């Protein structure tokens, strides 16, 4: 309670990321050209890059996220992105701000060559496929601890022929939303 003559601190509205039951509600973020499934995918990426679990991404986390998605991420660019998107002045990006950034970036990078570059980041052995081992390596490089079942689920969602590997065609189809399991 505020003392007499003092104003109580301003109350910030909680992020619209969770509904009354405390669960993330992708429907709150759906807009023309963006499906619930796409919102969920971006939320998964957000959670992956929010390595400290604060429900916001700081400059270090944003740089790792952009680099892993195949974008050049110079410090000046990162700070400019945060400045451009940080509507609440926190110096960090919350999910709504991240969603705005990623939907803009995704529309810019749909060319096959750009998608190939991203695929190559994951295909560390240049075998032409992304395996569980490849995903494990990427997660480790990002400082993310994910168990094999979570990583395998990612592979299973993209793998069209059930061989436990993601080909470039599988990856391209997921990235361009031609298929989504």
Curated annotation (Swiss-Prot):
Record keyword Cell membrane present: no
Positions with a binding annotation for Ca(2+) 2: 86, 88, 90, 92, 97
Keywords: Calcium, Cytoplasm, Cytoskeleton, Metal-binding, Repeat
SMART domains xrefs: EFh
Protein name as annotated: Caltractin ICL1d
GO cellular component, one term: cytoskeleton
Pfam families from the UniProt entry: EF-hand_7
Family, per entry: Belongs to the centrin family.
Localization terms from the record: Cytoplasm, Cytoskeleton
Subunit structure: Monomer.
UniProt main location, coarse: cytoplasm
Sequence ranges assigned to domain EF-hand in this UniProt record: 37-72, 73-108, 110-145, 146-181
Domain of life: Eukaryota
Region (Disordered): 1-29
A molecular function GO annotation: calcium ion binding
UniProt cross-references to Gene3D superfamilies, sorted A to Z: EF-hand (1.10.238.10)
Role description: Plays a fundamental role in microtubule organizing center structure and function. Component of the infraciliary lattice (ICL) and the ciliary basal bodies.
Keyword Calcium: yes
InterPro entries found in the cross-reference section: CALM/Myosin/TropC-like, EF-hand-dom_pair, EF_Hand_1_Ca_BS, EF_hand_dom
């Amino acid at each position: 309670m505020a003392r007499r003559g003092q104003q109580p601190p301003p109350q910030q509205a909680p992020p619209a990321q969770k509904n009354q039951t405390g669960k993330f509600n992708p429907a709150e973020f759906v807009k023309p050209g963006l499906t619930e499934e796409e919102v969920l995918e971006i939320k998964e990426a957000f959670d992956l890059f929010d390595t400290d679990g604060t429900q916001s991404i700081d400059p270090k986390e944003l740089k790792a996220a952009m680099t892993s998605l195949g974008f050049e991420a110079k410090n000046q660019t990162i700070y400019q992105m945060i400045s451009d998107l940080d509507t609440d002045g926190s110096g960090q990006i919350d999910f709504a701000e991240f969603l705005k950034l990623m939907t803009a970036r995704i529309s810019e990078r749909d060319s096959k060559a750009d998608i190939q570059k991203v695929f190559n980041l994951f295909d560390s052995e240049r075998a032409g496929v992304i395996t569980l081992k490849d995903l494990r390596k990427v997660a480790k490089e990002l400082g993310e601890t994910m168990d094999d079942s979570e990583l395998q689920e990612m592979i299973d969602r993209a793998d069209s022929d059930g061989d436990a590997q993601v080909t470039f065609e599988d990856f391209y189809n997921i990235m361009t939303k031609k298929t989504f399991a």
